[in-house]
């Protein structure tokens, strides 16, 4: 692993323990639970399907094992968060470290037991093997499952039985890549790297299952997560989810999955996954300006709370969607009992303060507003969300499509500073992430923050971290979350004690890079602190 930003002993302490029952995972990623449910629905016996805890995978690999599937969200550390905090993979991430360790143990178990199980990697991160194909052979991967456009995870839960039967029967070995099929296509890719050639079997799947073909989970998902919709409809060029067609779960379907988490997992909260909760129930083909469907959202959250959960929050939402209907967020807050002791977190893509970049890459993200109104939308949304006890966690993209100018970066810095000054009691966090080529920009290049000559990107990182430490960690982050938890108390103490260290590290980096980097840091301290 080498010299990590976060020492391994600290990472292992912070990383939540996942319980198991004789090696069977009590909780599992939601997508994996969907595949499990699809297999059971399609005729596989319960004793033949197991979602194994990764620490106990060896218990379930033997001579009779046909398939070992791994759920991989960021297997090689190329996701935006990981790329940012490993300086563009200059250090090995814990994602990559533990994924490699898992595959090493799978291969060791196969060798020990004489198993001929086919190992297949699936999940939203399998596109990364296209950039590091040497890992395919190193990990002994029989196949890699990916969507038609790589970055988007395929929806095999609607056809799980067919997929695994094809695997077991060996049909993917001789499937004609040129034959028109309605479900799967096999592509044997060749990658030339230096003096070596690597090959990989990529199984593409692009069929869109109808709602009645999508199974409901039968065992608990991690963190009480359940999805309420697929797709987004906003059309941001840098996002892969927008490539997926829109479908909405009925409130009844949502309730059934929450009840599984309550009854089998003892969970008292529901983490509602969507890629923009404010799109739920909307028909973007007829709703020209993407105004939210307030009635549908109120019905959805009323159904969620009727299950008896104490807390619920959506994973993602747009700032424009939060304010497009002035009654929406206040009404939802009443339904969910949001308040000072029951704050609602939501991740929102701020992306950039640059009006130019927003208009070029994400203009429908602002609908029903116009790109030139972007700063007003951000400020008004923070005000509205906070007044109703919602806390947005902003993500930003640094080096968007390698098209970001210094002035674009300064617009972002100024916007955050204006929010602090105009709304001194506001609650939000801001996390800058390096650009990763997915979605409609998958042919672009990764943005390498470590080798760039523009000091403004360091300034964006510096300003956002200063905000998170001064306004986030010290003012409200340590006041939320699980009360009385030893782990939470310890984490809060670490955050308050160590939270300022990255600022010093960035100042040191600026001194090492030279005067123009130092001037950016000093300008922020003088004008935007």
Question: What residues fall within each predicted segment?
Answer:
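Radical SAM enzyme core and accessory elements
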Residues: 1, 459, 463-529
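Acidic, low-complexity intrinsically disordered segments
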Residues: 2-3, 7-256
């Amino acid at each position: 692993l080498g010299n990590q930003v976060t020492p391994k002993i600290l990472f292992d302490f912070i990383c939540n323990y996942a319980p198991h029952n004789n090696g069977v995972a009590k909780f599992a990623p939601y997508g994996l639970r969907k595949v499990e449910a699809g297999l059971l629905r399609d005729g596989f016996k319960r004793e033949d399907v197991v979602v194994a805890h990764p620490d106990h995978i060896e218990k379930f690999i033997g001579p009779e094992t046909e398939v070992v599937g791994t759920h991989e969200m960021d297997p090689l550390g190329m996701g935006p968060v990981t790329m940012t905090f490993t300086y563009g993979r200059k250090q090995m991430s814990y994602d990559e470290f533990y994924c490699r360790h898992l595959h090493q143990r799978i291969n060791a178990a196969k060798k020990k037991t004489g198993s001929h199980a086919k190992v297949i990697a699936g999940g939203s991160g399998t596109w990364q093997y296209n950039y590091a194909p040497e890992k395919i052979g190193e990990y002994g991967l029989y196949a890699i499952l990916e969507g038609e456009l790589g970055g988007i995870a395929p929806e095999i839960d609607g056809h799980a039985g067919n997929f695994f039967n094809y695997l077991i029967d060996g049909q993917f070995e001789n499937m004609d890549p040129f034959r028109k099929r309605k479900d799967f296509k096999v592509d044997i890719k060749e990658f030339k790297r230096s003096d070596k050639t690597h090959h990989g079997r990529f199984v593409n799947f692009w069929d869109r299952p109808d709602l009645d073909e999508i199974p409901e989970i039968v065992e608990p998902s991690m963190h009480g997560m359940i999805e309420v919709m697929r797709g987004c409809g906003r059309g941001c060029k840098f996002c892969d989810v927008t490539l997926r067609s829109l479908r909405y779960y009925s409130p009844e379907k949502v309730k059934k999955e929450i009840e599984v988490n309550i009854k089998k997992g003892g969970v008292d909260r529901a983490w509602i996954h969507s890629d923009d909760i404010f799109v739920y129930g909307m028909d973007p083909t007829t709703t020209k300006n993407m105004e939210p469907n307030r009635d549908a959202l109120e019905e959805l959250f009323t159904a969620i709370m009727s299950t008896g959960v104490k807390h619920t929050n959506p994973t993602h939402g747009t700032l424009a969607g939060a304010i497009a209907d002035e009654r929406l967020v206040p009404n939802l807050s009443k339904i969910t009992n949001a308040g000072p002791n029951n704050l609602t977190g939501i991740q929102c893509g701020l992306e950039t303060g640059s009006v130019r970049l927003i208009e070029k890459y994400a203009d429908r993200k602002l609908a029903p507003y116009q790109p030139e109104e972007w700063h007003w939308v951000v400020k008004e949304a923070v005000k509205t969300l906070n007044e109703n006890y919602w806390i947005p966690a902003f993500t930003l993209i640094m080096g968007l499509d390698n098209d970001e100018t210094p002035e674009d970066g300064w617009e972002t810095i100024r916007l955050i500073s204006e929010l602090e000054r105009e709304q001194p009691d506001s609650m939000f966090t801001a996390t800058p992430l390096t650009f990763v080529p997915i979605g409609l920009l998958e042919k672009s290049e990764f943005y390498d923050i470590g080798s760039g000559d523009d000091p403004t990107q360091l300034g964006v990182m510096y300003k956002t971290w200063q905000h998170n430490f001064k306004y986030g960690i010290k003012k409200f982050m340590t006041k939320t979350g699980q009360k009385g938890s030893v782990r939470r108390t310890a984490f809060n103490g670490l955050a308050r004690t160590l939270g300022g260290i990255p600022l010093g590290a960035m100042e040191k980096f600026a001194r090492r890079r030279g005067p123009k980097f130092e001037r950016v840091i000093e300008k922020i301290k003088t004008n935007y602190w």
